[in-house]
């Protein structure tokens, strides 16, 4: 069964085409549409076993972008399917499912209405995610669609961990609580990591660290999310590329009063101008921070130390919550590729039973590999995440 997986952003569409069977999957193509709504848009199409294809032209909206993707998939030279009739279902990544969606589901009018109702608490992501669904309805009418939510895996978090100590009326009226994100990735790498380490996913204590430009740490107890570092929005928790992470709210209101900043301006400052970018005024990319660190830049040294320390802090917190830990997993763009970060975070965790193996860690990038010594009580691994495969799998299981 050929499944199209879409991840629609405000000005981009990431996609993969995967041929799914009960016990196997085969990637046929992947690509990205960028600069939607700008004067010059881009399509980069990468079919497996064929030459990549690029297109540069105005792409006014998501519907136009998806049409270009479908044209590329059936192109005689660069395509991977003979006809669009081969596409049996489309799976969508949706950032926020609120309390409505504890698992993936087939798209209905009710599902679309609930995604729309969450626009105000996920204004950067949900509108674009829904636009992808509506665009497919226009260009592939009748094809079944499935939504897979970043928040679903975290719906198992108990109230003691998801509630904020605010007046309860705000939860009743607005559902203000911790939701958590990156759930699709956390669940996938925990399952793969448990298998790699010979652990029972449903009878284990796993801490997953999804570290990229955005990042979160999750405590997984007996196969279910028990706590996670992101909160009501993806702003909370770790120091990130441009996001501040955990901070005293009074510091923000103080800055707002002193600078005469609106709520919108404060929100932009915390989400777009903070993190390692704000600390260094150099970059939001940890590779640039690493170079500045090596050159002795004091602000880069502070930023990287804070970045690593916050990850370690959540690992310690979640080990305490679960009464110990059996495995720590690193994933995401930084988690999969930064040997320095993994070693720095694990150094000092010997008291928890972590015995890190620097030799195994060296050069381990984008692979699934155990990074702890054979006699380490706590297993450590890097696992390459594959959210698109999870979306395709959920889609296949719901529509087959």
Question: PLM features: residue spans?
Answer:
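Catalytic phosphate/nucleotide-handling subdomain of diverse soluble enzymes
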Residues: 221, 226-262, 268, 332-363
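N-terminal glycine/serine-rich phosphate-binding loop of ATP-dependent small-molecule kinases
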Residues: 1-98
């Amino acid at each position: 069964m050929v499944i199209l997986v879409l991840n629609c952003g405000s000005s981009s569409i990431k996609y993969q085409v995967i041929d799914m069977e009960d016990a196997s999957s085969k990637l046929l193509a992947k690509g990205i549409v960028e600069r939607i709504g700008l004067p010059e848009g881009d399509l980069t199409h990468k079919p497996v076993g064929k030459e990549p294809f690029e297109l540069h032209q105005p792409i006014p909206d998501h519907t136009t972008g998806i049409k270009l993707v479908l044209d590329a998939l059936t192109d005689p030279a660069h395509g991977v399917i003979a006809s669009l009739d081969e596409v049996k279902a489309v799976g969508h990544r949706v950032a926020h499912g609120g309390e409505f969606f504890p698992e993936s589901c087939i798209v209905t009018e009710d599902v679309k209405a609930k995604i729309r109702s969450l626009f105000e608490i996920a204004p950067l992501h949900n509108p674009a995610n829904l636009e992808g669904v509506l665009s497919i309805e226009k260009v592939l009418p009748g094809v079944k669609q499935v939504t897979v939510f970043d928040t679903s895996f975290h719906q198992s978090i108990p109230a003691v961990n998801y509630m904020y100590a605010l007046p309860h009326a705000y939860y009743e009226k607005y559902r203000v609580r911790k939701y958590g994100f990156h759930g699709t990735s956390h669940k996938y790498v925990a399952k793969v990591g448990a298998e790699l380490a010979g652990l029972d996913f449903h009878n284990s204590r796993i801490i997953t660290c999804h570290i990229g430009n955005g990042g979160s740490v999750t405590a997984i107890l007996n196969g279910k999310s028990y706590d996670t570092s992101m909160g009501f929005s993806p702003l909370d928790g770790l120091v990130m590329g441009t996001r501040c992470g955990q901070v005293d709210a009074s510091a923000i209101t103080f800055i707002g009063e002193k600078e005469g900043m609106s709520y919108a301006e404060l929100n932009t400052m915390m989400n777009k101008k903070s993190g390692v970018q704000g600390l260094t005024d150099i970059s939001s990319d940890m590779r640039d921070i690493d170079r500045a660190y090596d050159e002795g830049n004091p602000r880069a040294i502070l930023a990287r130390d804070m970045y690593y320390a916050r990850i370690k802090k959540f690992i310690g917190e979640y080990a305490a919550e679960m009464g110990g830990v059996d495995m720590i997993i690193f994933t995401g763009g930084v988690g999969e590729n930064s040997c320095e970060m993994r070693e720095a975070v694990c150094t000092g965790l010997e008291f928890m039973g972590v015995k890190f193996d620097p030799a195994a860690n060296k050069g381990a990038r984008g692979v699934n590999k155990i990074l702890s010594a054979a006699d380490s009580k706590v297993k450590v691994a890097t696992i390459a995440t594959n959210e698109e495969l999870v979306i395709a799998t959920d889609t296949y299981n719901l529509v087959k």
